[in-house]
């Protein structure tokens, strides 16, 4: 919104220091985006055109005799609207207009001693085409008086950015209220007009569901010529039009904040009614003819009569916004500027707008009418401690009361003798944004100053609000992303499958009483008990489509024989690990341990143990149980060659894991050694039926000092019942670099345990 300092002086005496005023307004939350001086140049004075004669050598030029007080100057002018008896701004010799210095000159053979100026040439917004015509609205016109001695020509124009909740400041009066409250200067109210109304000229009726409040003045003997001071105010705000009545209406709305309208009348008495139209929008009807939609669209009045009906209206901004949102007719004509003001909250004191407009029209008021409507007071009660808690700053009771009273609030102490004291505050009806105690605290903070708040660290104790379902979801999403990073493609299958195929591959099936009673098809006649069957089908489809390297991942529900649901993860690889490309011209095939390593990158480290029972799908020598946290969580295996041949697949491997048995690693800090580690490789002769997992567990349980890790390296046949197992012992300390004696001591203790537990000995 734009307004001038001269506009503000209508309601309040503004301080002389304009820069300080802009700074203070911004502190109050009314951010001043720009402050532009609008001051007429020096040596531009008030003149009066005495005579106008055509130029003898130019059709479009006129030779004017202009009285500037001390003398009469001959000035050549090219404006079409120049005429005798006009008061005009005259730039004398030496005046700087823009970048041009005015001097005596000769135009087409005729001397010219000055320049008659337009508003643009003076540095003001455009008022009209041609020269600027002065009138008494800017002050008493004295010939020869400097133009910048008149207030409208010596001012500053402020552009103020408002937040949507401050509709009360979308007017000159609203900004003046803030200045009055901050500087403790009196506010000049809009004067009420004294008149004796006639009766019977207007009949006003309003429907039962009408929420808007409307007030009317019937006037006559009005003056509809827009004076210069109004033109300047509207031009500064980019609201000046060629319609004089619209200019007066816009000027009154801009100054008072009341939504104004006017109707031209041909006859009186009249039947005035307010009711909902076909779009359920409140509208005004005169003699049963629709004339406007309240707060949304006003008709432009062109053919003006002697009598005018002035209208002031107020609509609750929330109610209006809801109606606009629910409006089904998207083609309805709307006035966006009108909606902008109405939806942010206009001034509900309708008499302010009517009195202001009538006074500037210099009209005679014949009658007044208004709808029955009363705004409910918004009362808030609070303790001083509440304000202190919100702001973190203790403000004296007297200061709080003073700030709120200056802003138009009614403040009283409820139960003065009670402790703590309770304040009761009634918000003014034009403050639509005041609804809670936090809003009251914000008003106090605006005037106390946010810079005066004491910075304090926030004291906050955060409790862990963990959602186990979300944590589970994120865990499996992370597993999926890891699988994708390892080259697996996610697949999804139905939970239904063929019972016969599952039995053929050696998977359990549902007990007969628990089978599906009405299967979709014979191919989907049971609930799946494994993800592997679907993965095999997907692998075959991809092979038939020409893919030679297939890696699939699936998470889904399976069911045991008791029809209990279990969440599992399935992995399947088929074909080549690396496609045919240099240096692997024939590609690189998968092997059991490469696949196991790939799965471990997804689910974490695990160990393997030999399967005790075999199924038709598993290779008898390349299958194992997956152990994690000393618990069996799944199976990993190469698919039996017979199954590969029957299904016409590439050589394939699979892993199926119980999803909820997977370990979820916590973020734990573990120390690491900054000292070098020592490595000792040992080849042990042990019984061929001894599992490495047993060896590892025995050494771990013994807690041999400095022995941090034992790894299997190689295995080969030694004799009928024994094998040679090569293992690596990693030895290091967190405290120091170990010497040979300490390293050998750890190795010797390990050998003693292995000999005792497994009858193992070093190979000679």
Swiss-Prot record:
SUPFAM superfamilies named among the record's database cross-references: Anticodon-binding domain of PheRS, Class II aaRS and biotin synthetases, Nucleic acid-binding proteins, Putative DNA-binding domain
UniProt domain FDX-ACB: residue ranges: 673-763
Oligomer status and interactors: Tetramer of two alpha and two beta subunits.
Transmembrane annotation, as ranges: none
E.C. number: 6.1.1.20
A GO molecular function held by the record: magnesium ion binding
Gene3D superfamilies: 3.30.56.10, Bira Bifunctional Protein, Domain 2, Ferrodoxin-fold anticodon-binding domain, Nucleic acid-binding proteins
Species name: Helicobacter pylori (strain ATCC 700392 / 26695) (Campylobacter pylori)
Pfam family name, one: tRNA_synthFbeta
NCBIfam families: pheT_bact (TIGR00472), YtpR (NF045760)
Leading EC class: ligase
Cofactor dependency: Mg(2+)
Gene from which the chain derives: pheT
InterPro entries: aa-tRNA-synth_II/BPL/LPL, DNA-bd_dom_put_sf, Fdx_antiC-bd, Fdx_antiC-bd_sf, NA-bd_OB-fold, Phe-tRNA-ligase_IIc_bsu, Phe-tRNA-ligase_IIc_bsu_bact, PheRS_beta_core
Keyword presence, Transferase: no
Cofactor annotation remark: Binds 2 magnesium ions per tetramer.
B5 domain mapped to chain residues: 375-455
Reaction equations catalysed: tRNA(Phe) + L-phenylalanine + ATP = L-phenylalanyl-tRNA(Phe) + AMP + diphosphate + H(+)
Stated name of the protein: Phenylalanine--tRNA ligase beta subunit
Binding site for Mg(2+): 433, 439, 442-443
Domain named tRNA-binding: residues: 38-148
């Amino acid at each position: 919104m734009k307004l001038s300092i001269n506009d503000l002086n209508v309601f309040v005496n503004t301080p002389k220091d304009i820069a300080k005023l802009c700074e203070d307004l911004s502190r109050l939350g009314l951010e001043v985006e720009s402050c532009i001086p609008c001051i007429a140049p020096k040596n531009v004075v008030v003149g009066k055109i005495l005579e106008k004669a055509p130029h003898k050598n130019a059709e479009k030029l006129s030779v004017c005799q202009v009285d500037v007080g001390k003398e009469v100057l001959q000035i050549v002018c090219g404006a079409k609207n120049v005429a005798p008896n006009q008061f005009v701004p005259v730039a004398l010799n030496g005046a700087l207009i823009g970048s041009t210095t005015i001097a005596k000159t000769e135009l087409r053979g005729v001397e010219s001693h000055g320049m008659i100026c337009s508003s643009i040439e003076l540095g003001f917004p455009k008022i009209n085409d041609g020269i600027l015509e002065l009138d008494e609205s800017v002050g008493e016109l004295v010939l020869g008086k400097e133009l910048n001695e008149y207030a409208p020509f010596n001012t500053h124009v402020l552009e103020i950015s408002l937040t949507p909740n401050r509709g009360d400041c979308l007017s000159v009066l609203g900004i003046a209220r803030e200045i009055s409250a901050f500087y403790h200067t009196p506010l000049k109210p809009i004067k009420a007009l004294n008149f004796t109304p006639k009766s019977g000229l207007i009949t006003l009726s309003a429907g039962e569901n009408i929420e808007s409040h409307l007030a009317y003045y019937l006037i006559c003997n009005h003056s509809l010529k827009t004076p210069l001071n109004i033109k300047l105010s509207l031009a500064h705000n980019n609201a000046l039009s060629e319609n004089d009545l619209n200019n007066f209406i816009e000027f009154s709305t801009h100054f008072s904040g009341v939504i104004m309208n006017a109707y031209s009348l041909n006859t009186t008495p009249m039947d005035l009614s307010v009711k909902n139209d076909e779009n359920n929008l409140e509208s005004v009807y005169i003699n049963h003819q629709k004339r406007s939609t309240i707060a949304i669209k006003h008709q432009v009045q062109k053919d003006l009569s002697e009598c005018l009906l002035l209208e002031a209206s107020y609509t609750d901004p929330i109610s209006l916004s809801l109606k606009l949102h629910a409006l089904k007719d998207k083609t309805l004509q709307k006035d966006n500027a009108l909606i902008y003001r109405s939806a942010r909250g206009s001034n509900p004191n309708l008499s302010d707008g009517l009195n202001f407009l009538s006074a500037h029209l210099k009209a005679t008021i014949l009658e007044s009418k208004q709808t029955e409507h009363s705004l409910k007071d918004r009362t808030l009660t609070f303790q001083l401690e509440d304000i202190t808690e919100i702001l973190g700053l203790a403000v004296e009771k007297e200061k709080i009361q003073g700030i709120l009273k200056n802003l138009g609030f009614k403040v009283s102490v409820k139960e003065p003798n009670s402790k703590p004291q309770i304040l009761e505050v009634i918000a003014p009806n034009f403050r639509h944004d005041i609804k809670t105690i936090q809003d009251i605290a914000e008003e106090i903070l605006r005037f106390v100053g946010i810079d005066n708040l004491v910075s304090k660290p926030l004291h906050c104790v955060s409790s862990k609000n963990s959602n186990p379902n979300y944590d589970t979801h994120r865990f499996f999403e992370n597993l999926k992303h890891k699988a994708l990073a390892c080259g697996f493609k996610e697949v999804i299958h139905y939970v239904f499958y063929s019972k016969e195929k599952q039995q053929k591959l050696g998977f359990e099936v549902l007990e007969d009483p628990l089978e599906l009673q009405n299967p979709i098809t014979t191919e989907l006649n049971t609930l799946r008990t494994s993800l592997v069957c679907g993965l095999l089908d997907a692998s075959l489809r991809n092979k038939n489509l020409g893919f030679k390297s297939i890696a699939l991942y699936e998470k889904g529900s399976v069911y045991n024989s008791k029809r209990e649901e279990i969440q599992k993860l399935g992995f399947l690889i088929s074909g080549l690990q690396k496609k045919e490309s240099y240096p692997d011209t024939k590609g690189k095939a998968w092997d059991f341990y490469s696949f196991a390593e790939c799965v471990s990158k997804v689910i974490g480290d695990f160990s393997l143990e030999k399967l005790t029972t075999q199924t038709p799908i598993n290779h008898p020598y390349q299958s194992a149980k997956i152990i994690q946290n000393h618990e069996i969580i799944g199976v990993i295996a190469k698919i039996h060659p017979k199954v590969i041949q029957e299904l016409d697949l590439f050589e394939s491997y699979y892993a199926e894991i119980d999803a909820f048995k997977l370990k979820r690693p916590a973020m734990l800090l573990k120390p690491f050694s900054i000292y070098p580690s020592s490595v000792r490789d040992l080849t042990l002769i042990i019984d061929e039926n001894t599992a490495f997992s047993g060896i590892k567990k025995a050494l771990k349980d013994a807690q041999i000092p400095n022995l941090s890790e034992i790894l299997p390296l190689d295995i080969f046949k030694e004799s009928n019942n024994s094998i040679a197992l090569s293992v690596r012992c990693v030895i290091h300390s967190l405290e120091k670099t170990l010497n040979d004696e300490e390293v050998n001591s750890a190795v010797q203790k390990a050998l003693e345990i292995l000999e005792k537990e497994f009858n193992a000995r070093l190979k000679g």
